[in-house]
């Protein structure tokens, strides 16, 4: 079980590395620079990531992941459908994150000591991802409607709730968002904004 759990935790890094490669390719960054920004500790090793930097399209990337039987192939394909004509990678990135976190949280549904520690850690990571996503929507008001932004909330029963997420995404500005969070579990962060 420990090996399976470790593999699921490393799946998050595979998702991170895949998103890094996609962003690097989108920015036309040199391959060496893209690879230097990855942490190949999971299923996608250095060789696989280097190969993905050479794949020319998102569809070809999906095909490559499927050929390799990567666990990220299915969520990548689903995210790719959401990208559609817009070419906006956020839908694809969200599908990868949702899958990686959901798989790991499902694996730690037990009540053992190790599972509790890992579950709390995963919830912290999901809270962080939700907080940063809400801030992005606050910053990029025109990017998505509140309903669309709400679809990107990752469920993990963490301390940063859907109500917190909606409050931040709908705030007037960052200071207002932090003021709304003053009586929440992330009040220390909220207190850094005067």
Language-model region placement:
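Extended alpha-helical surfaces
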Residues: 1-194
């Amino acid at each position: 079980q420990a090996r399976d759990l470790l593999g699921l935790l490393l799946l998050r890094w595979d998702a991170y590395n895949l998103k890094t490669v996609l962003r690097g390719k989108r920015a036309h960054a040199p391959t060496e620079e893209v690879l230097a920004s990855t942490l190949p500790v999971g299923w996608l090793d250095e060789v696989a990531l280097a190969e993905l930097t050479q794949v020319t399209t998102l569809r070809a990337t999906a095909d490559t992941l499927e050929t390799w039987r990567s666990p990220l192939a299915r969520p990548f394909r689903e995210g790719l459908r959401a990208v559609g004509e817009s070419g906006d990678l956020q839908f694809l990135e969200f599908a990868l994150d949702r899958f990686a976190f959901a798989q790991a949280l499902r694996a730690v549904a037990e009540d053992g000591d190790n599972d509790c520690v890992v579950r709390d850690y995963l919830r912290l990571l999901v809270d962080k991802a939700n907080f940063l996503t809400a801030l992005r929507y606050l910053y990029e008001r025109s990017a998505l409607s509140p309903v669309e932004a709400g679809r990107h909330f990752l469920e993990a029963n963490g301390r940063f709730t859907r109500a917190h997420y909606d409050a931040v995404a709908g705030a007037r500005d960052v200071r207002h968002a932090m003021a709304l969070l003053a009586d929440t579990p992330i009040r220390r962060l909220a207190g850094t904004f005067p």
